[in-house]
Amino acid sequence: MKLLILFLAALGAASARIRGHTIKG
């Protein structure tokens, strides 16, 4: 279960980064 939470957290961070990059660019 911990691994799943960690994976979701990493995915959310990557998504936020991509979203911010898209808005900036």
From Swiss-Prot:
It is found in: Secreted. One of its GO terms (molecular function) is hormone activity. Keywords: Behavior, Secreted, Signal. GO terms for biological process: negative regulation of female receptivity, post-mating; sexual reproduction. GO terms for cellular component: extracellular region; extracellular space. Residues 1-16 form the signal peptide. Responsible for physiological and behavioral changes in mated female flies. This is Accessory gland protein 98AB. The lineage of its organism: Eukaryota, Metazoa, Ecdysozoa, Arthropoda, Hexapoda. The gene is Acp98AB.
